[in-house]
Structure formats: structure tokens, C-alpha cells
Amino acid sequence: MPPLALLSTSDKTGVVEFARSLVNEFGFQLISSGGTAKALIAAGLPVTKVADYTGSPEILGGRVKTLHPRIHGGILARRDLPTDLQDLAATGIEPIDLVVVNLYPFEQTIAQPDMTLSDAIEQIDIGGPALLRASAKNFAHVTVLCSPEQYGPCLAELRQQQGQTSLIFRQSCAQKAFWHTATYDQAIATYLTSSDPTEISLPPRLSVTATQFQSLRYGENPHQAAAWYRTGTATGGWSGATQLQGKELSYNNLVDLEAARAIVAEFTEQPAAVITKHTNPCGVAEGDSLVEAYRRAFQADSTSAFGGIVALNHPLDGETAKAMTETFLECIVAPGCEPEAEAILKTKSNLRVLVLPDLSQGASLEIKAIAGGFLVQQPDRQPIQPQSWEVVSQTKPTEEQWQELIFAWKVAKHVKSNAIVVTADRVTLGVGAGQMNRVGSVQIALTQAGEKAQGAVLASDGFFPFDDSVRAAAAAGIGAIVQPGGSKRDADSIQAADQLGLVMVFTHTRHFLH
């Protein structure tokens, strides 16, 4: 009896060539349905349509095609079990040896902006997952393929095994099939949850399925294994970035790049540059040109900028690229790169240069592992709304101070708590990050700023529990402070600001970052 293959694919890539090899090299008989059958017949291949094979026509507008005992019995039958073989013989069912199925493109469909719920439901595949699961369950006897990428390896296996496949190969294929259906079902459940007006923003059940996108040399340290995973079939975000040159990205590179991206995404108008080290900004600046923004960000803390990660909000030009070659940098990311800039940066062959067209696209959820589970939160995408800020001091800010406070607040949002940022003329002068007490971060930021703190502004990601930070800022020459407010001792801080002639603004929004 010649081997029997069932082919029913949504993605027709390579299926005709694969089927031709099955027939010509290994003598397979083909069963197929719908568009796949049409494609194979058009290519001149001998095909039995599923409806002819089962004796049952497609019904319900194609919703029921392959859900038939003649199909599933042929797949699930155990060839080493006499009773199963007797059942096949009694019902005239032939065993099916190879199943090639990929599913309706549900995730691509729901990504379309005009997609309705009813349209999405029609893209939920029923027969396909049933075929994959049945074949994968019976991997002891059946080979199952769920992706065009598997056609080549399968043909190589058939050639090596004289028209057969090994148990190890079939088990590997079954594993891929079950992952495929699990990911598919998760996408459907997630979509239906997001479409449910009664559902809360974070569902009571959460399943995360991801595919390894790239193996990484190691994690934060050489003794830690690491890999880069992509959720779903998403092509946006970092997996959609283009690396123009440089060494492979490391785990730490990606973590720092994401931090730099999040900061620079706050600046959408004037040219802006961000330089980060260990996820904290060591220099952030705006400028009339991109090269000016970069030079100002670099000069903000040139010592820390050495070996830093740079993010730009405008396409990288030649003049800026030339300035960047003057020091050692690990990575650069920008929404574009002009040919002149690309040519200049090639002199730094190890420098990683990436193009990420949409810098604003961040993660949909933030996940942090803890013992026995993980924590999930929505990203801090609270828009900065100066119109809702409150001036609580007697001294009112000038327009120039107001704009500077906005700039400082944008940066402070992305600094590890306790976070203090000192800025003037749209450039960071001092950054106090990650200290266990707020006044400690204040002292670090003011020390970095030095004499430049005179007339500068200070932003704090959280409220001041005491007035000591306000007094330290005033002693250094700070002219205006922006903070969330909300402390039981807010009155003490306001009183200190008034006594010392400082502007104080409450945002009524906290931006802790741990």
C-alpha cells in the first residue's frame, strides 16, 4: 500500500514543490482540501479531494471539511495494535502517514485595524488544530508538519530513511505541532478577553507563549544562560529592528537599548539624544540639530557615556555619526540611518547600529519573575499632562522654567527610584538614581551638577518625605522643583520652598521605577 499524505494549508509557501517530491521520490498518494487541492491540481499533481475521499461534501460554508472518521481514524490508528487495524479494515479506512497542516492566520487577521469580532471569529480554525493534535498524539506512527520551514528537513529525513521517518524526528515534529496549537489557542483566548467589555484590564488567567528569536551568549553575567524570545508572530518592537553592523547583541545590550528607547520616545519634536548606562540615563539633551543634541548629551557626563548606549529620535545623519566615532560606544539606535552616516560608522566595525522605525512601540505588559510566579503590570504610559499640574509655591514659574520642568520630568520618569534629575537648557546636569533614601539621590545629582545647578530645575519621581531635599536643592542654587506631592509633610516642603524663594510644582502623578 503506498503511503498516504494529507495536505491542508493556509500558507501555500512551498507546498506544491514539497508535494511533488512526495509523489515523485517516495510514491505518496495525496489527499487535500480547498485551496490547497486547487493549487496541487493546477500544478498537475494527482490529488484526491477530501470530500471525494470521505464521501461527505464540505458543509456550513467550509466550516466542516476534514472532521470525519475516515480522516481522523486514519490518523489516530495505532499500527502496532491489532484491534485498531481490525477497525480500519472493517470500515475501509486507510492509515494516513503524513499530515501537513498550517492554520488560518488568526493573529495577522486581528492585527488589521478594521477587524470586527465576527470577522475574527471566522478566522478561528477548527479542523486544522484537530488534525495537528491527532497527528501529534499519534507521533509513534504519523509525521506531522505545521510550517513550510519543516518541508526541507522532512524531505531530507525521508531520503535518509528510505522513505520513512525516525521516531525521534516524528516526536520533534509533534512537539512543534503542540506548541503551534497552544500558541494559536492562546492568541484566540487573549483576543476574546480583550474584546470582552466586562473583562478587567488584567485577566484572571494569563498565558504567555513565546518563540525563541535569538540565542544569546549569556545573561547579565557569563555564568547565566539567556535567550531572546518573541511573543506571538509580532514583527514590531526589537525583533523588527534592523542591525546594520556590529557584534551580536547581548542580553545587557537589549536591556539597555530598551531603557534608552523608552526615554527618547518621550521626545517627539526637537532633535533629542539619550545616552544610558545600566538602564539609567547619564545624558539626555535636546538641540536645534541632532548633532547638537548628541554632543550636549555626551558632555552632560562624558565619563559615564564611555561605552554607553545611544538612542536618537531622528534619523542618524553624517555629522552626528562623525561625532559618535570620537568615543567608544556599545550601541546606537535611531528611527533611520542616512547612507553617509552608515558609511562613516563602518570605521567602527564592532559598534552595534540598529534602525528601529517606531520608537514609541513598547511592551504591552511588564512581567517580573518572583519565586513561585510572576508579577504583571501595565507599562507606565501615563501621558505627561502639564495642564493638570499645580503650582503650590508663592513664587510662580516663568515660561522658561515651566518648559524646563517638563523636560526634567520626562527624564525622571525613566530613572531608577529614588530618582532625582537636575536639568538646565534642556540638558541633564545631574542624575541621582537608585538610592535607598531620596536625599541621597538629591546629593548625588547636585554634586554632579556642581556650579551649573545655579538657576537649574530639579525633578523627583516621588514625593519628599521631609523638607531636607528642598533645602539642599536651594543651597545648591536650584530655582524650581517638580515632584508628585502626596506626602504627609507636603506643607513642610512647600513652606521651605516659600522661605527660600523656590518654585514648587506638584504633578499629582508618581513615576516609581524599580
Curated annotation (Swiss-Prot):
CDD domains: IMPCH
Keyword Endoplasmic reticulum: no
Reactions listed under catalytic activity: (6R)-10-formyltetrahydrofolate + 5-amino-1-(5-phospho-beta-D-ribosyl)imidazole-4-carboxamide = 5-formamido-1-(5-phospho-D-ribosyl)imidazole-4-carboxamide + (6S)-5,6,7,8-tetrahydrofolate; IMP + H2O = 5-formamido-1-(5-phospho-D-ribosyl)imidazole-4-carboxamide
EC number: 2.1.2.3, 3.5.4.10
UniProt keyword annotations, A-Z: Hydrolase, Multifunctional enzyme, Purine biosynthesis, Transferase
Entry keyword Lipid biosynthesis: no
PROSITE patterns from the UniProt entry: MGS (PS51855)
GO cellular component: cytosol
Domain of life: Bacteria
MGS-like domain location: 1-146
Gene Ontology biological process terms, A to Z: 'de novo' IMP biosynthetic process
One example GO MF annotation: IMP cyclohydrolase activity
Pathway named in the protein's UniProt entry: Purine metabolism; IMP biosynthesis via de novo pathway; 5-formamido-1-(5-phospho-D-ribosyl)imidazole-4-carboxamide from 5-amino-1-(5-phospho-D-ribosyl)imidazole-4-carboxamide (10-formyl THF route): step 1/1; Purine metabolism; IMP biosynthesis via de novo pathway; IMP from 5-formamido-1-(5-phospho-D-ribosyl)imidazole-4-carboxamide: step 1/1
PANTHER family: BIFUNCTIONAL PURINE BIOSYNTHESIS PROTEIN ATIC, BIFUNCTIONAL PURINE BIOSYNTHESIS PROTEIN PURH
Family: Belongs to the PurH family.
Entry's free-text remark on domains: The IMP cyclohydrolase activity resides in the N-terminal region.
Protein name in UniProt: Bifunctional purine biosynthesis protein PurH
Source organism (scientific name): Cyanothece sp. (strain PCC 7425 / ATCC 29141)
Gene that this sequence comes from: purH
